[in-house]
Amino acid sequence: GTSDTETFLGAIEAWGIKKTLDLSVGMFSFGIWDKRNNLLTLARDRFGEKPLYYGVTGEGIKKAFIFGSELSGLKAYPSFNNNIDKRSLVQYLRFSAISAPNSIYKDIYKLEPGHMLKMELPFDGTIQKSEPWWSLDSIINKNNSYSKYSEMDFIEELENVLTKAIRRQSISDVPLGTFLSGGIDSSLITALLNKNSSKSIKTFTIGFEDKTFNEAPYASAIAKHLGTEHNETIISSIDILDVIPELPRIFSEPFADSSQLPTYVVCREARNNGLKVALSGDGGDELFGGYNRYFWSPNIWEKISWMPFNVRKMIGGMNLMIPTEVWELLKMGIQVDKFGQKVHKMSERMKHVKSIDELYLSLISEWNNPMKLIQNYETERIDMEYNLSHEIPAHIKEDQAL
């Protein structure tokens, strides 16, 4: 056969699992059963683009090891009775997402990106620890001679790498298009795909009736410049509210990124227009340090770290006594949205943080103490004072490396 799955099986048969993983390109997750050795192997692609859940459910003779690409599949197992994991709930309320290896359910886990898990059967109730088959750190350490390259060298190499990736992605049995927001990342992906396509590509954009948030004109200008077959959908707050009841069905577990709402709508519009595969600019900010938090923490810490902690605490308290409206009047030409609110947030952090790591984590935390929001959290004797680092999702640790 010629399908991806059949090709994968043929490669494993010829080379074994580890070499096949090393030679693989793209996104995947799979489970493969070795009948001869009673061995089940689960594996996930390098960056975790494809999900893979696994864990234990049931009790007594009904206790079983289960796995699947969606939590909904695991929940369909007849004896599934796993409760909400309250520590995962704390992580969700603090960081707006639940990162691997945790999941919203007790004893159910996400296989981490670039990891594999081997399970010998029959199942004895114990889950072995997953192991990395690929590591981003090893790639970074292997290529540490960056100083000899110029900025233009990096730009040219980046264009070569992106072009190669786009060409690989454009090999498809169905029409291909892009989600075009008009920003740098999606515009770059669209331009490269259009350049390497033999025919006009389709682009899709979501705009908003509220012109404050509407960036559709930028996307339209890019589409016109590139000559794409552009589709624009303008949505209202009512349209967004209509989507919300669908989210629990669409996503396996909660996450608080509001972009999931327009993303669902643009996917629906693309599908209705005959498009089954689309590329987007997601991940650009994470890869290239595009978020403010990456440089705010070191800049702020450099300015306040020389002060003794008690002095920082006192200044933070004094700043909080000044209303946010007054701070807006005092900003004197500083081009920062919601300046007063941000001064208050920073001042609150100054009262507690004692290191740059604590400052970074506090700035990306939605709640200072989410444990207080969860019913019976303390009475169940879960350690409320355990180190904040225990909650840190893997992607946030990677952010810190930037």
Predicted feature descriptions by range:
Residues 1-252, 263, 267:
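Cysteine-centered catalytic environments shared across enzyme families
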